[in-house]
Amino acid sequence: MSSKPFTPEEARRIVQVLQKPAVFLNMTTDWPALHWTVEHLSACLTKRIRFRVGKRSEDMAPLFETECSYVEATIKEFLSWTANDGEPLVGPFLDYHCKEFWAYADYKYIAQLFQDKPAMFQDVVWSDFGFPGRDGRDSTLWIGTQCANTPCHLDSYGCNLVFQIQGRKRWHLFPPDDTACLYPTRVPYEESSVFSHVNVIRPDLKKFPAYGRARLYTVTLQPGQVLFVPRHWWHYVESVDPVTVSVNSWIEMDMDDEARVAEALTKTIVCAVKSSPSLDNSDQWLNPTEDGVSSHDENMQYLNLAVKVCMNKKRDDIEDQPKAEAVKRDFSGVLKSPASPPSLVSFGPHLIPVHLTEKPQCSSTKDSCCFSCTDSPQCQITTKDQDKLRSDNKLGQRSGQSVLQDTENPGGSGEMHISTNDVLECLVHPDVIALVTRLIMCRQRELHS
């Protein structure tokens, strides 16, 4: 086994302590998964998988997964499509020219893809990061073309380790404290994902003026590198090179117990509101990654179960602590002694911090398939504009539109219209859900103490 810059214990401590994104170097030099290029995978996996297809666009609105097309194809067929250079299109990608569209096989669980080749699970060695037993079975595979992207979002559970295998990916990250600047939305609804209304590559600052205050961290992840994404950091990811392959694993945390209560509450509200028939409630609100709409009874059962598990876990944690000491946790949610000294992380050639970018810059370099227009005159917004936007209270999402705006009422006179989605945006806003979750937990503790 080759020498690593960090022992598993050191790597795990770094992951537990770090509160900002960072890149590990030279930790995967002996991982067999380094050879998981798209050519290698095409020989290992012959069954068809689903690719999300989107048009290369300069729109200011984000392209959500509900607005994409989907193609069932083998990786070999995908490879042939990416290699097409003006030849007549054939196969599953017949309707999509590779110069006009991108394709992304995302969120593919390796345990399902290679269930008949379990030996491949060992190719991904997360135990090197201090998580023994974690391998490909606990990971997802991502295969995409240039410009393939994931809409800006945050993950409700855990932290994230991302191993880049082939090609480069550009990551745009924002800290949890900047959530208000990213205009969070739960439509389209996906369990454990909070999306942003903002296209962070081409932001519309007239609709989303607060985004101008968001703190942007950027990094281009190279093959062999591993990116650490802390809990609840927003991220938008796009493929830079013609073909990219990466593998990630979400690392569970004790704090996920309460997050599951919040997610169960969110799902209950979203399903209840969006399942109600109304004239403005016919949009595609459920993400294609979801199996279907569960009933209100099912959602309430899951909410009760999540609350019960969380309460039992908190009760066990408190009982395990000496009575004279307060219960404290480190960043990963693990209980620690109040006397424990703070741990510091030393950056160097094998651990590089992801740096803050002062402001989004216009870019037309080869490293980016899109560009940000925040410096152009039409994207500038004055203080007067900001005051008007605030007074207009333009927030939320109308059916088929990204923000509330003046519209014609049935009688023909122009007036402001509040839609079902506008109300829902407020009800399931992360701040509101966090408050209601705390109220539920406090009330249940009172009833069962």
From Swiss-Prot:
Residues 102-266 form the JmjC domain. Residues 396-410 have a biased composition (Polar residues). PROSITE patterns: JMJC. Residues 385-416 are annotated as: Disordered. Gene3D superfamilies: Cupin (2.60.120.650). It comes from the Eukaryota. This is HSPB1-associated protein 1 homolog. The lineage of its organism: Eukaryota, Metazoa, Chordata, Craniata, Vertebrata.
